[in-house]
């Protein structure tokens, strides 16, 4: 069959309301999945037979995404398993928008899900987190300076020893 006879062709418009509704539904499902955070709180539970899970929007703490990982900067209890599950679900949902055969719906849904990942990242950032980060950076800077000073002192001692040996 040639391209003109094919019943399935990619379109580049938002003109089909059915496709738009499918894309919107997939986006809402994906955004909800990306924004929800299920975690088990630390400490003893009141009922040992019942699993005590909490659901919140966004992770508590501040995290930064990288292409192949996550850097937990301040008190974040996001697990690697949770991230992998979210990535797989997001990928599958974006690919399911291709059933609409509408490139605009596919692109808009994919972009929306990517933005929901970013929203998940910054959902629960606290002003205190910035102060903690600044304090941690300051401590690291001081540690580096101390190490450099120790290295310089060792070099000076070595040069002094060499001078004494030559004399």
Curated annotation (Swiss-Prot):
GO cellular component, one term: endoplasmic reticulum
Location of this chain's protein in the cell: Membrane
Membrane topology according to the record: Multi-pass membrane protein
Segments passing through the bilayer: 21-41, 87-107
Sorted UniProt keywords: Membrane, Transmembrane, Transmembrane helix
Chief location category: membrane
Biased composition (Basic and acidic residues): 136-159
Sequence segments annotated as region (Disordered): 136-167
Protein name: Uncharacterized protein C688.12c
Organism encoding this protein: Schizosaccharomyces pombe (strain 972 / ATCC 24843)
């Amino acid at each position: 069959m040639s391209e003109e006879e094919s019943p399935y062709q990619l379109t580049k418009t938002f003109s089909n309301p059915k496709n738009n509704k499918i894309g919107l539904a997939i986006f809402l499902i994906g955004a909800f999945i990306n924004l929800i955070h299920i975690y088990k709180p630390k400490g003893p539970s009141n009922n040992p037979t019942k699993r005590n899970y909490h659901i919140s929007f966004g992770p508590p703490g501040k995290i930064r995404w990288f292409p192949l990982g996550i850097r937990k900067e301040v008190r974040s209890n996001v697990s690697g398993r949770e991230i992998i599950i979210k990535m797989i679900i997001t990928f599958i949902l974006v690919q399911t928008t291709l059933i609409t055969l509408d490139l605009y719906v596919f692109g808009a849904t994919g972009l929306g899900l990517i933005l929901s990942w970013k929203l998940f990242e910054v959902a629960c950032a606290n002003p205190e987190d910035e102060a903690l980060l600044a304090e941690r950076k300051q401590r690291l800077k001081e540690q580096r300076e101390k190490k450099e000073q120790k290295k310089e002192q060792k070099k000076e001692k070595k040069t002094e020893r060499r001078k004494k040996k030559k004399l």
